[in-house]
Every structure is written in structure tokens, then in C-alpha cells.
Swiss-Prot record:
Domain of life: Bacteria
NCBIfam families: atpD
EC number: 7.1.2.2
Name the record gives this protein: ATP synthase subunit beta
GN (gene name): atpD
Amino acid sequence: MQEGKISQIIGPVVDVDFPEGQLPSILDALYIVRPDGSRLVLETQQHLGEERVRTVAMESTDGLVRGLSVVNTGKSIQVPVGSEVLGRMLNVVGEPIDGKGAVNTKKTYSIHRSAPKFEDLSTKAEMFETGIKVIDLLEPYSRGGKTGLFGGAGVGKTVLIMELINNIAKQQSGFSVFAGVGERTREGNDLYHEMMESGVIEKTALVFGQMNEPPGARQRVALTGLSIAEYFRDEENRDVLLFIDNIFRFTQAGSEVSALLGRMPSAVGYQPTLATEMGELQDRITSTKNGSVTSVQAIYVPADDLTDPAPATAFAHLDATTVLSRSIAELGIYPAVDPLDSTSRILDPNIVGDDHYNTAQAVKQILQRYKDLQDIIAILGMDELSDEDKLVVSRARKVQRFLSQPFFVAEAFTGLAGKYVKLEETIKGFKEIIAGKHDNLPENAFYLVGTIEEAVEKAKTL
């Protein structure tokens, strides 16, 4: 083991001097044993001359002093992988943070791994049912694909992710890995306790590097979660789900570290390596011929500006986008998915079939027509519309309300039982509304229900 000494500390960045000829390699993990016996992990980022390296700390550097001894492990950060991590909560370096003792796995993986080889990739396109009407109908997720949940602050990204974890664990009994990247610790705590209550925790591994942690941890924790998911894909040939909340914080942490590492900032103050860092992470999230990693990533949009470099870079990697809209949330329609702004690569008649494709296009068409008529309604009122347009508006408002749905994870807030709606039920419901089969029902009957039969039942009580 090579030993060095701390020469300078600037916030989360620590410079370490090593004897000549013993410099650690880039991305090697170093560790310091603090006076209280705890270990602090550093990751080598730059070589400054022949004897000094610049590193980024994975935990707070409070209490470190110059001259402390630093040990080079000779390899990158290694995290435990395998079925033993299911039901556990880990930090960025793979240490348990749930107070349930050590995680004893037979294997460890480096958090920095190569993307699968080109010939190993699978190109099969198939839909992945989530049980959430608006997603399954209008922007279907693909198995082994990447989906982005875009939204500003407080429109429901985390609730939607929690619902997806719940539905997938219960309906499809798949394994999930959740990486909490730079989000609120309270939300992570809520998620953990809700998972324990619902029993979903047994099929999920949780990895957290939250807002209160230094940028090194927030920049690397998504990679930790990804390595755990890759093990299930490559060694156990499973289809795994990887949830990242929030991918924007991954970029944000990179930009915090970048200036301290002496790099020139690029557009809007982001790091010049933004596209490379994002590419290295996203390229590993893929399907091979053995198994798949399907990822759902929440993407915070700063100031609701989709052209900001961070969300814009993430866009390029996605197969489907679910855009959450504040204007829809203000109508009380949850999930607040914007049906006209959200897209999916696999909404194609060759993949999902003609029936699904045509219904989705009809829904989008009627909602777009309603949107076009809204200016006229605002100025002249409903009475000035032709009979045909009045019918379009009436059906569009029913469609809009039918796109809402009660969630299992929100039962405590809504007082309504959660609903999982199968794809054929979803298609059937929207086809009937558009065909005018339910023109006589009040629009409130369609709000926060599951299937069309429930809407008909609800109408009887109104």
C-alpha cells in the first residue's frame, strides 16, 4: 500500500503528496483514517506534477488537517453487488446507512465500468406496461430504454417515480435499484419507510447521496446504483429497473467540482465536460442479449427552461420523455403529464400495433384542437363555438380528466384507492370517449378513476 500526505484542502477537493514514482492512477480510490477511526474515501481526479494528485472527497472534509496520512487502494471505488444488497440502503462507497449491519456480498464491482460491447447489445423494441394510463397510451416506455421525467419544482416527479416502483415490484415482481442523487433527505426517508410498509423493499436496492452531501458523493452515487443494476443484468440475466432521482443533480455536482479542479466553465457556468460525463453514465444504461436495464430518470428543469444545457444534454439520450406541466397540475389533474409535449420512440404502429397507435393519435388530435380553441373560448365564450366544436371541447375535457388516475402511493393524500390499469382497458376507455359513447356523462365522472367502467359507476353517484 502506498501512503501519501495531505498537502492542501479546499472544500471537497483535497491535494495529496506521494513519494516520487508512487502516484495513484486517475480514478483510484484513496482513503484517510480519521482520528475517530472512520474512513473517508477520496477519488483521484488529476495529476499535478510528479508528486501531487488532486482528489475529490466522497464525504465531508471537516476535521481533516494537512499532513494526515492517505492510503492508496490501487483500484477504483468498489461497491458490493448481488442479491444481498436487496432491501438495503447504501451510500456512494457501498457502506450501509440503514443501521442493519454490514452488507456481506461475494462480489464487488467498480463504479467505473465500460459500456457493453456493440455486438452484445439487444435491438429488440418492446413496450413496458406501467399501469399508468397517460404513460401507457401516449408515451409508452420501452423495455431496456431510457425515460426522462421532466418537470420544475413541485409538479410530482418523485411521486410518479414512487408509483412506478410500486407498480413494477407488485405487478411484475422485478428488481429495482433506486439512486437518490442530490435530492431531499426527507423524501428518501419517506420512500424507504413506504417501501418497508408495502413490502416492496425486499426487491429494491437503495443508494443515496443527498443534498446535504459533498459534490463528490452526488457526482458518483448514480454510478454506484448503475453498477448494482449491471450485476443483475450481466450475471443473473435479469430485467432490472434503475430509478435516478434526480439526474440534474448529477450534472450540478459535476459543475461544483469542475471549478475547484481548475477547469474553465462553459455555457451557463456548467463544466466543459458536461456532455462526456452524461454520455459515460447513459451509455452503460442499456439492454444486452442477456438482460436489460430500463431506467426512469427524474430531470429537474431549472426555472422551467428546457433549453438549459443540463436538461438539453439529457434529452439526447432518451427513448421517451414524460413532461410534467405546472399548468396541468394547477387544474388538479395528477399525474400532471403534458400529453402533447411528452414523446416516445416506440409509439409506432409496427411496435405497439395499429389500435394503440390510432387511439393515441386521436387523443392527441382532440386535445390539440381543444388547445387551439381555448383562445376563442377565453375571448368570446363557449356560446360562439359551432356545435361541432362544442362537442370537441366536451370530449376533450373528458379525455383530459380521464388521463388522471389515483395513485397507490398517494392514497394518504387523496383518500382514494390506487389503480393499476391494464393497457387494453386504457385503450378501450379512450376509444369509447372519443367515439362519443359517453357524451351524456358529466365530465367529473372521469376524474381520478381507473377504468371507463369506474367512470360510468361514478356518474351514477353524481
